[in-house]
Amino acid sequence: MKMTSRKLSDILKKRLQNDSWSFHFDREKDSLRIEDKNTGKGITLELPGIIAKWEQKKDDAIDEVVYYTEEALNAMKGQSQEMEGRESLIYPVIRSTSFPEKSSAGVPLVFDGHTAETRIYYALDLGNTYRLIDEKMLEKEGWTKERIRETASFNLRSLQTVVKEDEVAGNHFYFFRANDGYDASRVLNESILAEYEKNAEGTLAVSIPHQDVLIIADIRNNAGYDILGQMSMSFFANGTVPITALSFLYEDGKLEPIFILAKNRPKKK
């Protein structure tokens, strides 16, 4: 069966059927908007990305979308989304530069530049989901952008790190997977990158293919670049929130995107 946006929209509507929710399929934008009728809050699902995952994972991909959608809508309805008094629940999240700059309601989101491929957004953790912080929230609660940055950075450094090491063809790869929603965000923790750079025997490279993994690689031979490229593409294709399939060289505290060419050293983008 060939999956189309219309078919996927119909499947999701059936799976998410709820008298309190409304659905709007936008054919031009290839998206499905789901809103709580009582609160007016909701989420917009980008269907092409879900179809790409469905082609690889079939019903498992739809199960994931249904789970996260239900969690998000229930959280929006049942929890306060004020920042005051919940400072410890504010974290930075990494997204691609193609990620929207405004919320579904048209309110500008709070974000900073990061690399040519990525941006830093800020989120209020709601348990099994989160809300991206927008400028309206800042204005309402009297917060400054600098306060958000400092608070999120402090909270990020307090998170526990869970790292798995793997050696492939003489190269060392370190996978950060605490599964707390902020694994990719750990790329913003300068002390982590500085430590790995100090101990690296080869060239230090970094990959942030999706929000739930950070890969740090100690590349000790040319094969390592190919291996990292393959890993990055695989994680990117299977992530719930993809970020970028490109990898980065880490030198002197800076990340520079690179293209990894088979059998060769990478070319700077």
UniProtKB/Swiss-Prot annotation:
<comment type="similarity">
    <text>Belongs to the UPF0354 family.</text>
</comment>
<protein>
    <recommendedName>
        <fullName>UPF0354 protein BLi03134/BL00047</fullName>
    </recommendedName>
</protein>
<dbReference type="Pfam" id="PF07285">
    <property type="entry name" value="DUF1444"/>
</dbReference>
<dbReference type="InterPro" id="IPR010838">
    <property type="entry name" value="DUF1444"/>
</dbReference>
